[in-house]
Amino acid sequence: MKLDKNLLIIPLVVAVLVLIFPFVAFSGDTIMIITTTSMLPVLNPNDMIVVESASIDELREGDIIAFDSHQKMGIIAHRVIEVFEKDGDMVVDTKGDNNEKPDPWYVTDDDLIGKVKSIIPVFGIVLVGPVRFALVAVIIISAVSMMKDYITENRSKK
């Protein structure tokens, strides 16, 4: 049974759009995938967040920010609980909504990546792990099949 090559275009286009959409739609912003439960129930693992650049002066209590912890924890998204001056510099005290205590460090302007602009629930699952590999496989299989059909058609025309 020969597959209709037009049917192969549909999953190819969908897979490419799903992989490219976040980067095009939110160009200029930083896209991150939540991997922990520290911000439950607001942010769940596999949620995608869009982070816009911000400075500490723009932050308010209650904002969710992304920052580099410069420790083994890497990039973190937590809620601002206080913005204040310490030793002549503005700093931010943060806490995960699902954590009992505030973070044991202060976020400086150098650490700050930005403020969370939007949350896309569960969408991160298509950009990480097995689903991403499945989408890449769909793209490769569709492309190879379409090239094979194209070559076969061109040979039969000669």
Regions found by a protein language model. Give the residues of each.
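Extracytoplasmic
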Residues: 27-29, 60-62, 75, 87-89, ...
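Extended, hydrophilic extramembrane loops/domains of integral membrane proteins
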Residues: 81, 87-124
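Short coil-to-beta-strand transition motifs
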Residues: 6, 69-78, 106-108
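Structural motif
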Residues: 46-48, 60-63
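Protein maturation boundaries and topogenic segments
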Residues: 1-48, 53-54, 119-158
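Short, charged beta-turn/beta-strand-edge "cap" motif at the junction between a beta-strand
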Residues: 54-58, 71-74
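Conserved positions in beta-strands of structured domains
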Residues: 35, 78-84
